[in-house]
């Protein structure tokens, strides 16, 4: 590549990172947190571990909660979220029950604050569009970064953490970018398509069918095809249906049971889920039974859709790390997805640190560290407040974030301010994880493991910063 063209790519990479880097880190951190959003909600409520109750028992309990309704939607429990949700319609779920104890569970927790931050920056649908645009920015950074460093693949294993903070940040930036490149591309493209695709669908619906825009979504979902009635069994109850469903449809994983007109002869039962080997969500894979007794009358299968529709369907599960459709590999891929998200945060933060360390006393450098360190520190305080804080968690998050910004602006040494932030976060994550791990007998242990990993990352940064502040030689300052 010509030197002039490579220099232009390098300048574009630095400019895009400088302008959008802080927002990108905030969204990536919130996204990584969101991967464990459901587990963190249970973590906050200190729910015990144990074997889940039979699915038929949980379903009967759920239907009994809203027995007077014309329609009931029951979201079935999963390994990641052992809770059964009873809804009047999707999004309106007044009853949540633990799949282990059958006891009520709170529908929300303060740990949902960073999740909302990632989804829409607390700005509703316009915020969702802004978040999607950062996916475009990340794509630009990934392309320009690959062009700049494409001849340095041999350096992907190098991490000089004992030779100064700048070299450590530089190597960390290269290492995370090269090792996690496929996942970063996945995050960028699916993140951009997630919001922009929804916006495009909404605009199309207003133009094509302004009187009934929901019809566009119905067309995307596809129509039910009639099954071959020969050999299909009939069921006297929903419980019997769910018990025999795995044997009858071994590749179908149920996630939602919808009942219309329960208790009547014209009742309709729709079981939504995913199929093994097909990336999708519950609204695109459905089986429908009608009447008394229940007879299979419709099958909706995304495999019958066109290639572009199937790509649209796959965006959400790929972006949120929902790998249920890959059966046995799902836990490992979900863990890898989280690690890639964690690496994406390190990638962005190390790139911003390189810029901030070039002018540590400038206002922009201090704001960068404060705005990026703020949400991490605020989440640490959120986790600690689950045990002994009398403060309102929704007020704690923005307050701690703002205090962190002022702290980095006013503290004499920026590197020492960052060192203190890293130490507090590391100690807070370790304390919260260990206390929960031992007090709840291992429930949500994978959440505690993720918190300990985050603490290790903060501690490593603290060690490097401590060496920088301790060392006065020219070698350590470079």
Place the predicted regions along the sequence by residue:
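Conserved histidines in hydrophobic membrane contexts and catalytic metal-binding motifs
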Residues: 1-478
């Amino acid at each position: 590549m010509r030197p002039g063209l490579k220099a232009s790519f390098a300048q574009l990479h630095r400019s895009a990172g400088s302008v959008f880097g802080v927002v990108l880190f905030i969204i990536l951190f919130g996204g990584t947190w969101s991967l464990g959003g459901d587990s963190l909600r249970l973590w906050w409520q200190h729910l015990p571990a144990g074997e889940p109750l039979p699915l038929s028992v949980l379903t009967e309990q759920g239907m009994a909660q809203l027995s007077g309704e014309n329609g009931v939607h029951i979201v079935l429990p999963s390994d990641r979220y052992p809770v059964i949700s009873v809804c009047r319609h999707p999004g309106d779920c007044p009853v949540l029950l633990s799949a282990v104890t059958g006891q009520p569970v709170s529908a929300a927790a303060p740990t949902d604050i960073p999740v909302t931050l990632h989804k829409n920056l607390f700005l509703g649908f316009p915020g969702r569009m802004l978040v999607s645009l950062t996916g475009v920015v990340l794509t630009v950074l990934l392309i320009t970064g690959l062009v700049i460093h494409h001849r340095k693949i041999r350096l992907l294993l190098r991490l000089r953490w004992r030779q100064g903070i700048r070299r450590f940040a530089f190597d960390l930036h290269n290492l995370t970018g090269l090792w996690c490149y496929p996942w970063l591309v996945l995050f960028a493209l699916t993140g951009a398509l997630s919001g922009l695709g929804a916006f495009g669908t909404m605009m199309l619906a207003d133009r094509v069918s302004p009187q009934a825009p929901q019809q566009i979504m119905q067309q995307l979902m596809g129509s039910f095809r009639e099954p071959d009635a020969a050999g299909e069994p009939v069921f006297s109850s929903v419980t019997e249906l769910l018990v025999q469903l795995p044997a009858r449809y071994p590749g179908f994983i149920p996630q939602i049971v919808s009942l219309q007109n329960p208790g009547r002869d014209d009742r309709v039962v729709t079981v939504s889920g995913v199929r093994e080997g097909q990336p999708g969500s519950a609204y695109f894979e459905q089986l429908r039974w009608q009447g008394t007794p229940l007879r299979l009358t419709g099958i909706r299968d995304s495999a019958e859709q066109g290639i572009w529709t199937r790509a649209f369907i796959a965006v959400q599960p790929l972006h949120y790390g929902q790998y249920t459709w890959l059966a046995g590999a799902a836990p490992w891929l979900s863990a890898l997805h989280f690690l890639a998200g964690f690496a994406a945060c390190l990638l962005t933060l190390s790139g911003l640190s390189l810029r901030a360390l070039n002018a540590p006393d400038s206002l922009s450098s201090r704001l960068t560290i404060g705005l990026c360190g703020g949400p991490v520190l605020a989440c640490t305080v959120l986790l600690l407040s689950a045990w002994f804080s009398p403060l309102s968690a929704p007020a704690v998050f923005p307050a701690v974030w703002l205090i962190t910004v002022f702290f980095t602006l006013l503290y004499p040494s920026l590197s020492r301010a960052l060192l203190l932030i890293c130490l507090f976060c590391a100690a807070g994550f370790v304390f919260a994880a260990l206390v929960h791990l031992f007090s709840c007998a291992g429930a949500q242990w994978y959440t505690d493991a993720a918190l300990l990993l985050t603490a290790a990352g903060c501690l490593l940064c603290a060690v490097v910063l401590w060496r920088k502040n301790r060392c006065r030689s020219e070698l350590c300052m470079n």
